[in-house]
C-alpha cells in the first residue's frame, strides 16, 4: 500500500469537501474503543509475588511488545523476564513517575470517545485502515509509541503536562510543550497512521519528509474535529508567530 497515492487521494477529497473545510463527523460506525489498561495491570503485578504469570495470561501480545520495545527482551517466557521488569521499576524516581502517570489517567472515558470518533472518521476515508487494539503503558520516559500487528500503545508518563518537574531534567522547552494530556489523542492517531502508511520517500530529502508528515497531521487534525495544523503540532502561539515572520528565511534554509 503506497502512502503517496492513498494519502494524496484522501487529501484531494478533503480539500474538495465543503470548499476545503471537510466535516469531521463520520457516518461510518465502529465498535466503541476501550483502552486496555496494561499500565494499571503491570503496576499491580509488580506488587504481587505471582503477578508475572497473571500478566502473561492477560496481556501476552502487549507484554511481548513491551518487553522488546522498552526492555530489549525478546522472550516473555524467560524466567528472568519479569524480574528484569521488577528491577527496572524499583528505582524510586521511576516508581513515582509511574504512580503519577496512573493518577493523571485514572479516567480515560473522554479519550476513548475522542478516539472512537476519530477512528470512525479515518475508517470512512481510508477503508483499508485497520482499527487497532489500544493500550497504555509506562516506559520510564523512553519508548513513546509501541506498535504491533494490531496493537497500539502510548507511554502515558510522557504526557503529564509541560510543568511536570521531572521533565526539566530531560527535555527542552520546545519538546515539553507537546507532553500534555491534550496531545495524547493526536499521537495515538499519528503513531498508527505512520505505522500503517510508512514513509517511502528519500530520507535524505527533508522536504519529502515534511510533506509526508504534513499530510498525516492534516488528516489527524480533521479526524479530531478540524483543528488547525498548529494545534496538532502543539506549538505555542509565539512560535507560530515567529515562523510566520521568518517563513522566507526558513524555506531558504530548508531548500
List the model feature ranges, each with a label.
Residues 14-17:
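C-terminal motif of bacterial Sec signal peptides marking the signal peptidase cleavage site
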Residues 8-12:
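Hydrophobic helical h-region of N-terminal Sec-dependent signal peptides
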Residues 1-7:
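Bacterial N-terminal signal peptides that target proteins for export
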Residues 5, 25, 29, 76, ...:
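Short, well-ordered helical secondary-structure segments
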Residues 19-87:
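N-terminal mature-domain "stem" immediately C-terminal to a signal peptide or N-terminal signal-anchor/transmembrane
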Residues 86-248, 252-255:
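Acidic/His-rich structured neighborhood in mature extracellular/periplasmic domains
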Amino acid at each position: 500500500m503506497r502512502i503517496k497515492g492513498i494519502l494524496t487521494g484522501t487529501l484531494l477529497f478533503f480539500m474538495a469537501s465543503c470548499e476545503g473545510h471537510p466535516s469531521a463527523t463520520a457516518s461510518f460506525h465502529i465498535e466503541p474503543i476501550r483502552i486496555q489498561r496494561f499500565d494499571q495491570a503491570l503496576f499491580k503485578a509488580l506488587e504481587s509475588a505471582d503477578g508475572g504469570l497473571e500478566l502473561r495470561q492477560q496481556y501476552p501480545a502487549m507484554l511481548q511488545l513491551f518487553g522488546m520495545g522498552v526492555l530489549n527482551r525478546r522472550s516473555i517466557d524467560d524466567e528472568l523476564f519479569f524480574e528484569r521488569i521488577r528491577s527496572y521499576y524499583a528505582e524510586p524516581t521511576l516508581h513515582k513517575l509511574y504512580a503519577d502517570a496512573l493518577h493523571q489517567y485514572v479516567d480515560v472515558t473522554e479519550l476513548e470517545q475522542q478516539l472512537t470518533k476519530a477512528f470512525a472518521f479515518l475508517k470512512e476515508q481510508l477503508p483499508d485502515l485497520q482499527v487497532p487494539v489500544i493500550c497504555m503503558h509506562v516506559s520510564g520516559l523512553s519508548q513513546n509509541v509501541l506498535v504491533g500487528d494490531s496493537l497500539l500503545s502510548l507511554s502515558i508518563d510522557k504526557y503529564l503536562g509541560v510543568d511536570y518537574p521531572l521533565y526539566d531534567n530531560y527535555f527542552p522547552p520546545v519538546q515539553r510543550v507537546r507532553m500534555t494530556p491534550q496531545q495524547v489523542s493526536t499521537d495515538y492517531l499519528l503513531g498508527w497512521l505512520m505505522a500503517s502508511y510508512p514513509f517511502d520517500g528519500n530520507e535524505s530529502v527533508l522536504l519529502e519528509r515534511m510533506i509526508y508528515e504534513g499530510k498525516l497531521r492534516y488528516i489527524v487534525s480533521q479526524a479530531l474535529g478540524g483543528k488547525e495544523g498548529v494545534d496538532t503540532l502543539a506549538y505555542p502561539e509565539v512560535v507560530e508567530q515567529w515562523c510566520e515572520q521568518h517563513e522566507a528565511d526558513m524555506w531558504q534554509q530548508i531548500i
